[in-house]
């Protein structure tokens, strides 16, 4: 259960996992953005909150079947209370408020973080692989989000579509928007792609607009 996760985090912080005689390992890695919406989704707390059935950055259906903002629901208080305890006990880096995802990853790769929440790509090169190269004995495992009670935890999943192109019904040639997209995709990724012209500068710097 989530209670086990909390105790494991405490164990990382208090039982000297690297054997250097110091309590210098943090049980739970946290970056200053706190949730994925505010920073790179590495060492963010979305999964932590979801274990308490709390959803800090999305709209949910409340008990009355109405739309309600997840960040102000009662479940948030329980999650925040346990986070406060972890922070007070030294399980969370006291300087997390000034460390972004990259900075936290440096601690992770140095073997100074026991666990963290993140996305699937967090195991890629640089985010976790550097630590494995430095210390082959490091062994990371992926664990499903666990619930604080008997109700299964549900993860916040970003909606697949993030941008829309809208054309006025009064537009004389609405199909031009589709043609423009087709041209961009063709010149960047199609059979006649010219990435050196459309996807990078003469200095070979990537261009994304």
Where are the model-predicted features located?
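Extracytoplasmic/secretory soluble proteins
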Residues: 1-209
């Amino acid at each position: 259960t989530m209670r086990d996760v909390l105790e494991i985090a405490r164990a990382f912080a208090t039982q000297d996992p690297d054997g250097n005689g110091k309590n210098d390992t943090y049980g739970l890695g946290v970056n200053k953005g706190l949730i994925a919406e505010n920073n790179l989704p590495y060492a963010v707390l979305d999964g932590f909150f979801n274990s308490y059935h709390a959803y800090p950055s999305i709209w949910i259906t409340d008990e009355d079947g109405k739309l309600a903002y997840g960040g102000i629901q009662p479940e948030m208080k329980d999650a925040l209370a346990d986070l406060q305890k972890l922070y007070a006990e030294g399980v969370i880096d006291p300087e997390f408020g000034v460390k972004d995802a990259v900075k936290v990853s440096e601690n992770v790769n140095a073997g100074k973080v026991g666990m963290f929440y993140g996305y699937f790509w967090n195991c890629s090169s640089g985010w976790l692989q550097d630590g494995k190269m430095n210390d082959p004995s490091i062994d990371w495992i992926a664990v499903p989000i666990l619930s604080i009670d008997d109700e299964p935890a549900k993860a916040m999943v970003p909606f697949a579509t993030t941008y829309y192109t809208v054309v006025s019904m009064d537009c004389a040639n609405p199909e031009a928007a589709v043609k423009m997209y087709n041209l961009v995709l063709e010149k960047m990724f199609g059979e006649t792609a010219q990435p050196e012209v459309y996807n990078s500068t003469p200095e070979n710097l990537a261009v994304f607009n």
